[in-house]
Every structure is written in structure tokens, then in C-alpha cells.
A protein has these predicted regions:
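RecB-family 4Fe-4S metal-dependent nuclease core
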Residues: 1-300
Length: 300
């Protein structure tokens, strides 16, 4: 089990069954340009390599300025990662970009620099990790045990005069708008997945991270979604990438966690209930781009 699989079940239990029980695969689509998943991987890796290279790991505004003032370094890094992730080269990663990869490189460099400008606003912060994978062979939720795995995009600790706090960061290069009216919305398939998926993921990340790491039981942990497409507007308007439930910014996942874990426990019980069939979603909007729509017979 993983956060993405749990979100699939919320979207449509039948899709979850076809994909993760029967093991049916989605057809890979041919695209003329870079697909969103590959673009997201490139952005993730760019940010990871930059922050992994930092020494010390306390990131000051001056640290970020040194990167922003060295555009050639960021361009070179983009070339290497595009050649690896998009062109699938195993060697000669410094090969000059040609054709559509030139445009991809310009877009990647632009967005990485914009994200760094945003990070400069929250500096100083202690960079802790990127692409942190963790798993458990028998995670007990309610009365059910299951294998679980997650990968957190980034973890850092903002150093503030008002008190330090940990951030669990998820980069999103799609159209996610993580803002729901209530915790119930996170488990409601009639609510647009773009509004609930990222926050559901982050709440699970926070829970499992605290269980997996000693010393964070009482520490403030803030879930954050870096919406890459929105970074320009965020910088211009002075906004943040914080997420909201109702009208309230989620500054600590614990403020909502008792209710969240209660609903999550109910969901897991439903998923493992042998008397509960895997039914179609009630929200036909979830079917529009489903690869299994012909199998289930839903008329979209």
C-alpha cells in the first residue's frame, strides 16, 4: 500500500481493484513533448541535487543567492538531469541539448530558479532530506495490518524566532489545488481529486514519518505543497505554498490528525471488508481519463 494507491481507492474502488488487485496496467501513451511525470521527476531531482550539495545543511539566504547568481551551474545541472531522465542516457550526461530538449532545459531552469527564490523567503532553514523512502511490512491501522511504503519529496526545518518547525514538502507540477472544506472531503470521491489528493498524501507522510523517527512526537510539523506552476503568482503576490482545510492554514498536521486517522481507519476497514464490493465511483468526472473505462462499462 502507498499514498497514491490509497488515493486511487478513494477515487474509485473499482479502479483500485483492476489496477492493484488484478494487476492490469495502463497503456503508455506516446507524447510529442515531455510528459508531466517526467517533467516532475526532473524538477524533483534538480532541487534534490542542489540541496544535497549544500554544506552546511543550514540554508541561508546567501546560500540560495550563490546558486541564483550562478545560472550557468543550474543550466549545466539541468542538462545532465534532462539527458538522464528524458533522453535516458547512461553516460555522456553533459552532452549538449538539441531539439525539444533545449526548450525543456529553459523551462526547467526557469522554474528551479523561481522555486529557489521562494525558498530564499523562508530561509534560514535546515535541509534534512529529499526523496526519503520508508516502509513497514506490517503497519497496523485499526485491526488491519498491511505493507506500506512512501517517498517524501523533501523534509526541512524552518528556523524561526517564534520556534522551529518541520516541513514535509511535496512538489506538484500538475494542476493540484490543495484546499478542502473539511477532513471529510479528503475521503469523498465527489470532491475533485486535484483538491484532496496532495493533502491526503501529506497527512499520511506526516503520520508515518513521526512513527518512523524518534523525537518528533511533539514537534510542529507543517505539510506544504510546492505548486510549481503557481510559483510566479506566489512570488508576485507574496503568498505561500501552505495548504488549507476550510479557511484555516494547516500549520501543524496534528490539529486535524485525530479526525483524519479516524476516517483513514474506517477507509482501511472498508477496503479489507470481504463483504464490501469494489464499486464504481459516484463521480463521473473521475472516469474521463480512466484507462479502464471500457472494462467497467461506464458511459462517459
Amino acid at each position: 500500500m502507498s499514498p497514491s494507491r490509497i488515493n486511487t481507492y478513494i477515487d474509485c474502488p473499482l479502479k483500485f481493484y483492476l489496477q492493484h488487485v488484478e494487476g492490469l496496467k495502463e497503456d503508455e501513451e506516446m507524447t510529442d513533448f515531455i510528459d508531466s511525470a517526467t517533467f516532475g521527476n526532473i524538477i524533483h531531482k534538480m532541487m534534490q541535487v542542489l540541496y544535497d550539495s549544500a554544506s552546511p545543511k543550514v540554508i541561508m539566504a546567501e546560500t540560495i543567492d550563490s546558486w541564483l547568481n550562478n545560472k550557468a551551474m543550474i543550466e549545466k545541472l539541468a542538462t545532465r538531469i534532462i539527458n538522464e531522465e528524458y533522453c535516458h542516457l547512461k553516460s555522456d550526461l553533459d552532452r549538449e541539448l538539441v531539439g525539444d530538449t533545449i526548450l525543456i532545459g529553459k523551462i526547467v531552469v526557469y522554474y528551479v530558479r523561481q522555486l529557489l527564490k521562494y525558498d530564499k523567503r523562508i530561509a534560514p532553514f535546515e535541509y534534512k532530506n529529499s526523496e526519503l523512502a520508508s516502509s513497514k511490512t506490517r503497519w497496523l491501522v485499526g485491526t488491519h495490518e498491511f505493507n506500506y511504503r512512501q517517498v517524501i519529496d523533501r523534509i526541512d526545518c524552518v528556523l524561526s524566532d517564534d520556534g522551529d518547525y518541520l516541513r514535509i514538502v511535496d512538489y506538484k507540477t500538475g494542476t493540484d489545488t490543495p484546499e478542502v472544506n473539511s477532513v471529510d472531503d479528503l475521503f469523498d470521491d465527489t470532491v475533485a481529486s486535484s483538491k484532496r489528493k496532495a493533502l491526503t498524501q501529506l497527512m499520511l507522510y506526516c503520520n508515518f514519518y513521526v512513527q518512523d523517527n524518534v523525537g518528533y512526537e511533539q514537534k510542529q510539523i507543517c505539510p506544504v505543497v510546492y505548486k510549481v506552476r503557481d510559483v510566479d503568482a506566489v512570488l508576485v503576490n507574496g503568498n505561500t505554498f501552505d495548504v488549507k482545510i476550510g479557511k484555516q492554514t494547516v500549520t501543524d498536521y496534528r490539529d486535524y490528525n485525530k479526525e483524519f486517522m479516524g476516517k483513514f481507519t474506517e477507509l482501511i476497514a472498508e477496503l479489507f471488508d470481504r463483504n464490501k464490493p469494489f464499486v464504481q465511483t459516484k463521480n463521473i468526472e473521475n472516469c474521463k481519463y480512466c484507462p479502464f473505462v471500457e472494462i467497467c462499462g461506464r458511459d462517459c
